[in-house]
Swiss-Prot record:
This is RNA pyrophosphohydrolase. A motif (Nudix box) lies at residues 55-76. Belongs to the Nudix hydrolase family. RppH subfamily. It comes from the Bacteria. Its cofactor is a divalent metal cation. One of its GO terms (molecular function) is guanosine-3',5'-bis(diphosphate) 3'-diphosphatase activity. It comes from Brucella anthropi (strain ATCC 49188 / DSM 6882 / CCUG 24695 / JCM 21032 / LMG 3331 / NBRC 15819 / NCTC 12168 / Alc 37) (Ochrobactrum anthropi). GO terms for biological process: nucleoside phosphate metabolic process; ribose phosphate metabolic process. PROSITE patterns: NUDIX, NUDIX_BOX. Its EC number is 3.6.1.-. Keywords: Hydrolase. Residues 14-167 form the Nudix hydrolase domain. Accelerates the degradation of transcripts by removing pyrophosphate from the 5'-end of triphosphorylated RNA, leading to a more labile monophosphorylated state that can stimulate subsequent ribonuclease cleavage.
Length: 174
């Protein structure tokens, strides 16, 4: 939580560099996890809690490295093969009431580089609660979902991102 007391001008804050991962199974369905809501985070008060894995890019880390790391930290998945990298970075802005609070109060939203992977392993390797390596659980459930349904499952302020991601990777299930 930010210690800032008044309204924060979003234009004064940067976007947090992140990666997002669309993981498809052999049937062409996409892995989605239901977020655990933490009071004060960007999902607080949301009812659409399903999302694909995503996370920050550490200083000095390449996006592809961050993608593999985040996927493992959030889901335990290692048995994946890269299908494609989205050509563009996709941004989203936090809603005004979350600027200065969510994302540790440091960012106006995220700029995300998306990757599509094929899950090649056995579902028994998927571990979300607890995830491997002592990481904090981000999801309490997971399911394979049809790609076209993803935008309606995500919190509304990230919906445009999911529409763009689905458009970028739709051909992978055609």
């Amino acid at each position: 939580m930010s210690k800032h007391k008044g309204p924060v001008d979003p234009e004064s804050l940067p976007y947090r560099p992140c990666v997002g991962l669309m993981v498809l199974n052999k049937a062409g369905l996409v892995w989605a996890g239901r977020r655990i809501v933490i009071p004060g985070d960007e999902m607080d008060g949301a009812t659409q809690l399903w999302q694909m894995p995503q996370g920050g890019i550490d200083k000095g880390e390449e996006p592809l490295e961050a993608a593999i790391r985040e996927l493992y930290e959030e889901t335990g998945m290692k048995s994946v093969s890269l299908l494609e990298e989205a050509s563009d970075w996709i941004n989203y802005d936090l809603p005004p009431h979350l600027v200065g609070q969510a994302l540790k109060g440091k960012y106006r939203g995220q700029t995300q580089k998306w990757f599509a992977y094929r899950f090649e392993g056995d579902e028994s390797e998927i571990a979300i609660n607890p995830p491997p390596g002592g990481h904090t659980a981000e999801f309490d459930r997971w399911e394979w979902k049809p790609m076209v349904k993803l935008p309606e499952l995500i919190v509304p302020f990230k919906r445009k991102v999911y529409e763009e991601v689905v458009a970028a990777f739709r051909h992978l299930v055609a």
